[in-house]
């Protein structure tokens, strides 16, 4: 028997602490326990505002990086639990209050619904008349989340399955809650564990993305695809066998190559992968029957993603001494004009979670906006392309989420600069060089923004003026002086020409949106050019881009550049400026730089985020209005298969020019001036919500009014000075004192920062809910 000499044993690293924080509901039950001043209890009404501001700002609770990291990690599990409870509610409503069963049998003829209004005081008028007319015992209010389409795509066919999933989600939520408690109170990771980025990358890439995609591929092949095959074969949803994917013989009926005598695992291990091409395809484009991406293409896509990410998850150096070191790569990343390059950024990203979060938010926000565009151009779920209310809802939702995430990136980048930036470790690296060039960067960005603003808006003003003067020939328009978006058309042509070429000889086109060909206008579309489903509704069609698109895209550019200008200025000037050299000492948010320092108000990093939110709102509003009008005018509608005609939701506009009539889509003809946007889009399309009272859409009319009120209420906070409110409060307190009914907690007016926070929150809530009501009343009124 031999023993290993002691000196040769590798010491085991303990990466967790046992029982670091006792579980104490008594302590947590005391409001403000996490901060010394708050724990004393309220003296003034400011206390409740500070409670909200600081509850999740862990860095104000402690300066211990390890403790902060553990709190964030634990909170992630709590967040996942909340998401699972929320999803459980979705499944529960789908199981017990929806018309999912009926919708599955007639997805093109019914609108999804998962809630019905009881007949109290006539409120049942809110139930969708088509649902009531068809004699459904369940379902009433139309839902536009796309969940029914998603559920059908992934293999749900009965409400019993939805109920089981609802219970499963609650169980998963409970497990996440337990994990959050366990990893903070019983086995809490050490700071070293959080800073081990190579191991984290390997596990996230190979585990979460790689194996996650592989598991999903398995689900698609063994559950979703056989369910779809049975539905396509005419089997009633209630009779579909959800376990067919586990029966080799049954699968062989639907996929004879992959599950035939020469298929299965044998084909996999002998590298005869061509056998799998009946369920792992590369068809490209959309399935004509459903208007959705081919499910076999989606399975193939996820298998490819899984392969790539599992490989990527083995790239970084951990215990084995092979692979990349992030620190070495960053420090080697320098060029002839970049000084020290990325040296020091490893320390930044492993000691500042704000810096890491800022990068992740910027990427996640951008990806979410890309998702918004993919959802309509390459609709992933069956029959969703013709559910226009759902399509506009999903586009708007993803655009808003993306906008908020990107503003959040600016916020956390600024917090990093104030709280975590170390000038000593960032000497002549790219971060330091950007900060030293900040005046040039911001002034150039400012100039570009002004140029964009005057020129893009100037095109619209020019057109309004020419129209008012009766000179249509002098307008910038497809019918007069065209401004063709040549770069966008070039990108369209690249995508249209790619399939069948040398680069992709086997691939079909990704979407009909690219195939504009000789299309001179959306008004000339024919039925054979669009993808229309069995109910003759258009799912997607070629999208013609012209002068109107060129103009509005320059408005997008203006709005995006202003948003970036505000956020980037907030980040680059977060620590100091000529006006306030000691800004870093004042913190992330401060109202002004004290008395006698006029002109220093609204210059904190927080105030830049505050202003950035308004411009983000402007940006997203223009984008979703453009999308709504363009799709109704140029894409969505119906086809007449007997004549080959395409009838868009909004009919074409005849433009009279020099005695000749030119037919254009309404969007191409009207959106080229401000008057057109106000009259033909906002005013014309708001008729549905304004006239909704007394019908099933009346809830949206009330929401439209209420949201306008919330928006107007915000102006009271945004336009007023704090002094006015404090004086008003003092006089009310005086009256209470006279009557000896003064409260124990002294009333205080909101601080300047609190007032702005309340203002922007109500401004955005009011604006978003107004847009929501405007869109849904319009789209649900359509047949």
From Swiss-Prot:
GO terms for molecular function: 4 iron, 4 sulfur cluster binding; chlorophyll binding; electron transfer activity; magnesium ion binding; oxidoreductase activity. It catalyses: reduced [plastocyanin] + hnu + oxidized [2Fe-2S]-[ferredoxin] = oxidized [plastocyanin] + reduced [2Fe-2S]-[ferredoxin]. Keywords: 4Fe-4S, Cell inner membrane, Cell membrane, Chlorophyll, Chromophore, Electron transport, Iron, Iron-sulfur, Magnesium, Membrane, Metal-binding, Oxidoreductase, Photosynthesis, Photosystem I, Transmembrane, Transmembrane helix, Transport. The keyword Magnesium applies. Pfam families: PsaA_PsaB. The chain crosses the membrane at residues 72-95, 162-185, 201-225, 298-316, 353-376, 392-418, 440-462, 550-568, 608-629, 697-719, 757-777. Phylloquinone binds at residue 725. [4Fe-4S] cluster binds at residues 592, 601. SUPFAM superfamilies: Photosystem I subunits PsaA/PsaB. GO terms for cellular component: photosystem I; plasma membrane. Its main location: membrane. It comes from the Bacteria. InterPro entries: PSI_PsaA (IPR006243), PSI_PsaA/B (IPR001280), PSI_PsaA/B_CS (IPR020586), PSI_PsaA/B_sf (IPR036408). It is a multi-pass membrane protein. Its EC number is 1.97.1.12. Chlorophyll a' binds at residue 708. It is found in: Cell inner membrane. PSI electron transfer chain: 5 chlorophyll a, 1 chlorophyll a', 2 phylloquinones and 3 4Fe-4S clusters. PSI core antenna: 90 chlorophyll a, 22 carotenoids, 3 phospholipids and 1 galactolipid. P700 is a chlorophyll a/chlorophyll a' dimer, A0 is one or more chlorophyll a, A1 is one or both phylloquinones and FX is a shared 4Fe-4S iron-sulfur center. Chlorophyll a binds at residues 716, 724. GO terms for biological process: photosynthesis. Belongs to the PsaA/PsaB family. PANTHER family: OUTER MEMBRANE PROTEIN, OMPA-RELATED, PHOTOSYSTEM I P700 CHLOROPHYLL A APOPROTEIN A1-RELATED. The PsaA/B heterodimer binds the P700 chlorophyll special pair and subsequent electron acceptors. PSI consists of a core antenna complex that captures photons, and an electron transfer chain that converts photonic excitation into a charge separation. The G.violaceus PSI reaction center is composed of one copy each of PsaA,B,C,D,E,F,L,M and Z, and forms trimeric complexes. PsaA and PsaB bind P700, the primary electron donor of photosystem I (PSI), as well as the electron acceptors A0, A1 and FX. PSI is a plastocyanin/cytochrome c6-ferredoxin oxidoreductase, converting photonic excitation into a charge separation, which transfers an electron from the donor P700 chlorophyll pair to the spectroscopically characterized acceptors A0, A1, FX, FA and FB in turn. Oxidized P700 is reduced on the lumenal side of the thylakoid membrane by plastocyanin or cytochrome c6. This is Photosystem I P700 chlorophyll a apoprotein A1.
């Amino acid at each position: 028997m031999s023993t290993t000499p002691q000196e040769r044993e590798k010491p085991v690293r303990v990466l967790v602490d046992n029982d670091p924080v006792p579980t104490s509901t008594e302590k947590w039950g005391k409001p403000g326990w996490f901060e010394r001043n708050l724990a004393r209890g309220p003296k003034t009404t400011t206390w409740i505002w500070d409670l909200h501001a600081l509850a999740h700002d862990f860095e104000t609770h402690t300066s211990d990086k390890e403790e902060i990291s553990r709190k964030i990690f634990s909170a992630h599990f709590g967040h996942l639990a909340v998401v699972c409870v929320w999803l459980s509610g979705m499944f529960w409503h789908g199981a017990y209050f929806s018309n999912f069963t009926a919708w599955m049998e007639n997805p093109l003829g019914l609108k999804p619904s998962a809630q019905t209004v009881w007949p109290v005081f006539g409120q049942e008028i809110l139930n969708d008349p088509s649902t009531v007319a068809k004699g459904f015992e369940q379902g009433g209010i139309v839902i536009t989340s796309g969940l029914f389409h998603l559920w059908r795509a992934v293999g749900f066919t009965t409400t019993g399955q939805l109920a089981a999933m609802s219970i499963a989600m609650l169980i998963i939520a409970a497990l996440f809650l337990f994990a959050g408690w366990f990893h903070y109170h019983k086995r809490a990771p050490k700071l070293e564990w959080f800073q081990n980025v190579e191991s984290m990358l390997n596990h996230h890439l190979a585990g979460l993305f790689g194996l996650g995609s592989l598991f999903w591929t398995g689900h698609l092949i063994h559950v979703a695809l056989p369910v779809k095959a049975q539905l396509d074969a005419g089997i009633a949803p209630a009779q579909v066998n959800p376990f067919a994917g586990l029966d080799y013989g049954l699968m062989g009926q639907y996929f004879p190559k992959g599950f035939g005598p020469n298929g299965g695992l044998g084909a996999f291990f002998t590298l005869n992968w061509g056998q799998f091409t009946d369920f792992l395809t590369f068809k490209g484009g959309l399935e004509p029957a459903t208007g959705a991406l081919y499910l076999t293409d989606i399975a193939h896509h996820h298998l490819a993603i899984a392969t790539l990410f599992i490989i990527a998850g083995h790239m970084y150096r951990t215990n084995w001494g092979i692979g990349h070191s992030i620190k070495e790569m960053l420090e080697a990343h320098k060029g002839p004009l970049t000084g020290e390059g990325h040296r020091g950024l490893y320390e930044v990203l492993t000691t500042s979670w704000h810096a890491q979060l800022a990068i992740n938010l910027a990427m996640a926000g951008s990806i979410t906006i890309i998702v918004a565009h993919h959802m309509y151009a390459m609709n992933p779920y069956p029959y969703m392309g013709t559910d226009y209310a759902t399509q506009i809802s999903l586009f708007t939702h993803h655009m808003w989420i993306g906008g908020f995430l990107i503003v959040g990136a600016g916020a956390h980048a600024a917090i990093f600069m104030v709280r975590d930036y170390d000038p000593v470790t960032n000497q002549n690296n790219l971060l330091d060089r950007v900060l030293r060039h900040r005046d040039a960067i911001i002034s150039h960005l400012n100039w570009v923004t002004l140029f964009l603003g005057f020129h893009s808006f100037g095109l619209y003003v020019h057109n309004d003026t020419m129209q008012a003067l009766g000179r249509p020939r002098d307008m910038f328009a497809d019918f007069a002086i065209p401004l063709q978006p040549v770069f966008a058309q070039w990108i369209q042509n690249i995508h249209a020409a790619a399939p069948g070429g040398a680069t992709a000889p086997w691939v079909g086109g990704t979407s009909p949106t690219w195939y504009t060909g000789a299309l001179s206008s959306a008004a000339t579309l024919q039925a054979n050019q669009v993808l229309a489903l069995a109910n003759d509704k258009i799912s997607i069609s070629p999208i013609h881009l012209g002068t109107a698109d060129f103009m509005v895209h320059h408005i997008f550019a203006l709005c995006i550049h202003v948003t970036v200008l505000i956020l980037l200025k907030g980040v680059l000037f977060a620590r100091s400026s000529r006006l306030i050299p000691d800004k870093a000492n004042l913190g992330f948010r401060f109202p002004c730089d004290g008395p006698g320092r006029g002109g220093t108000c609204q210059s904190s990093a927080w105030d830049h985020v505050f202003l950035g939110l308004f411009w983000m709102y402007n940006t997203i509003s223009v984008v979703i209005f453009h999308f709504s009008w363009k799709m109704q005018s140029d894409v969505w509608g119906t086809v007449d298969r007997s004549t080959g005609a395409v009838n868009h939701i909004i009919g074409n506009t005849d433009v009279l020019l020099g005695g000749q009539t030119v037919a254009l889509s309404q969007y191409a003809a009207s959106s080229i001036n401000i008057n057109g946007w106000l009259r033909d889009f906002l005013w014309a399309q708001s008729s549905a919500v304004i006239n909704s009272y007394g019908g099933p859409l009346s809830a949206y009319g009330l929401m439209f009014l209420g949201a306008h009120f919330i928006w107007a209420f915000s102006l009271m906070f945004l336009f007023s000075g704090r002094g006015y409110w404090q004086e008003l409060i003092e006089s009310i307190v005086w009256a209470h004192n006279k009557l000896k009914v003064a409260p124990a907690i002294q009333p205080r007016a909101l601080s300047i920062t609190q007032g702005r926070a309340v203002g922007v929150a109500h401004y955005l809530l009011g604006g978003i809910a107004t847009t929501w009501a405007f869109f849904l009343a319009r789209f649900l009124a359509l047949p």
